[in-house]
From Swiss-Prot:
Biological process terms in GO annotation: antibiotic biosynthetic process; polysaccharide biosynthetic process
Class of this enzyme: transferase
Cofactors that this protein relies on: pyridoxal 5'-phosphate
Gene behind the chain: ntdA
Origin species: Bacillus subtilis (strain 168)
UniProt protein name: 3-oxo-glucose-6-phosphate:glutamate aminotransferase
Molecular function GO labels: pyridoxal phosphate binding; transaminase activity
InterPro entries in UniProt: DegT/StrS_aminotransferase, NtdA_N, PyrdxlP-dep_Trfase, PyrdxlP-dep_Trfase_major, PyrdxlP-dep_Trfase_small
Length: 441
């Protein structure tokens, strides 16, 4: 019987698909899972496909003078724009911009994709984390163990909920929280573990779950950069997502979601997300307070259209990451840079490399000035190094050795679905030249 390569829109299967399309695996049949996230794939995928030509329209040696890091006018492809405009013509005449049928449909579709019983769509990923913590029973002063190298929204959600962030070190290879450091930080006040799937890399959730069970802690995962990860939500009490336009899957505004298999938790999340009201009862409060944090019906309608491209867009990210890793291997082998590992537990929200701390600023400047290539340090200030009164009072003297070293070395290269291979060639050409000729490592 011929073996199959299943296309599910998840990271593990995308890796198998990449190997199949590159010819690394022979004699397997492609099977496209019947899912909204694969809808665009069905239109472009064939048994034999030239990835560079069919997905990227690659024209080798086409001259490129400027490479933006993340251009806002290319967050949505032209095909998606057309689909979204068609949807808006259906929604706008109804006047149902906030509540409406698309919201419920969006939650059901996302629930099916995530293999979670309940999904509550929210107005942002930040609100999703905050509501999730409160639904799990966070009380003022409860400690939440988390990394310090995430976007400030993660810590802000904890602080706004009354929790106390406890920052621990990361695994420097993955940029994700180190489970061994979690155990060292547990105190009688610890109630939660909040791992972040930073840059799209899945944290070591199985290990984290084991620690949580041992100490009777709750796990709420920040998967705002991790939609499409295989086994997402498997080891967490609550999974939170962001649909900011800059994410792997976004709407045309701010939105997010909470996912769980626990009915009681889902009920509480719904209550907290809409003013504390009892579910399906008009304006009757059943908890002390709640927020105005439901996703808008209009954004849900847009989300349903954009979800059709999720599998394809995440595959493009994987292909681009693989291309970087393969073609920049020489620089890594000579010790000039450190590349991330290509793995089946990554959805490549960002592409981080490491360079020598003392060279980073020069590399970024020369790439931009000499090759027109924009790079970035996406989160320039670590949470425990902010200059706020709280940080200076509570975290003064805190040292996170691996977090701080990785942060001083990290440099993000452009990577997004509308990124062209010609642009990527320009990035790599510039990086080779600057590091080998200009920096003189």
């Amino acid at each position: 019987m011929q073996k199959q390569v299943k296309i599910s829109g998840k990271s593990k299967e995308n890796m198998s698909l990449l190997k199949h399309l590159k010819g690394d695996v022979q004699g397997k049949e492609l099977v496209i899972e019947d899912s909204i996230v694969n809808e665009r794939w069905k239109q472009v995928l064939k048994e034999k496909i030239d990835i560079e030509h069919d997905l990227f329209n690659y024209q080798k040696n086409r001259e490129i003078s400027k490479v933006p890091f993340l251009p806002v006018d290319r967050l949505i492809t032209n095909d998606e724009v057309e689909d979204i405009l068609n949807t808006l013509t259906e929604v706008l005449p109804t006047g149902k911009f906030t509540s409406g049928p698309y919201l419920e449909q969006f939650e059901k579709v996302l629930s099916t994709y995530l293999h979670k019983r309940y999904v509550i769509a929210t107005s942002s990923g930040t609100d999703a984390i905050m509501i999730g913590l409160l639904a799990l029973g966070l009380n003022p002063g409860d400690e939440v163990i988390m990394p310090a190298n995430s976007f400030s929204a993660t810590e802000n959600a904890v602080l706004a909920s009354g929790g106390v962030p406890i920052y621990v070190d990361i695994n420097p290879q993955t940029f994700c929280i180190d489970p061994d450091k979690i155990e060292e930080a547990i105190t009688p006040y610890t109630k939660f573990i909040l791992p972040v799937h930073l840059y799209g890399k899945h944290s070591d959730m199985q290990h984290i779950r084991q620690i949580a069970n041992r100490y009777k802690l709750k796990v709420i995962e920040d998967a705002c950069q991790g939609i499409g990860l295989t086994d997402l939500g498997k080891y967490a009490d609550i999974t939170t997502l962001s649909f900011n336009p800059y994410k792997n899957f976004g709407v045309c505004g701010k939105a997010g979601a909470i996912a769980t298999d626990n009915e009681e938790l889902a009920k509480k999340c719904i209550q907290f997300s809409y003013h504390g009201f009892e579910v399906n009862v008009k304006n009757k409060k059943v908890i002390n307070f709640g927020f105005n944090s439901k996703m808008d019906n209009l954004q849900a309608a847009i989300g349903l259209e954009r979800m059709k491209y999720l599998s394809l867009n995440n595959f493009k990210r994987l292909f681009l990451a693989d291309r970087y890793i393969t073609q920049l291997a020489e620089l890594q082998n000579k010790g000039y840079i450190e590349l991330p590992e290509l793995s089946e537990d990554h959805v490549w929200h960002l592409f981080p490399i490491k360079v020598r701390t003392e060279d980073r600023a020069d590399i970024m400047t020369k790439l931009n000035e000499d090759f027109g290539v924009q790079t970035d340090v996406y989160y320039p200030i670590l949470s425990h190094m902010q200059k706020t009164p709280l940080v200076q009072d509570k975290y003064a003297g805190l040292q996170l050795v691996h977090t701080e070293k990785a942060h001083s070395q990290v440099l993000h290269l452009p990577l997004y679905p509308s990124f062209t291979l010609e642009e990527q060639d320009r990035v790599m050409e510039g990086l080779f030249h600057v590091i080998k000729q200009e920096i003189g490592v």
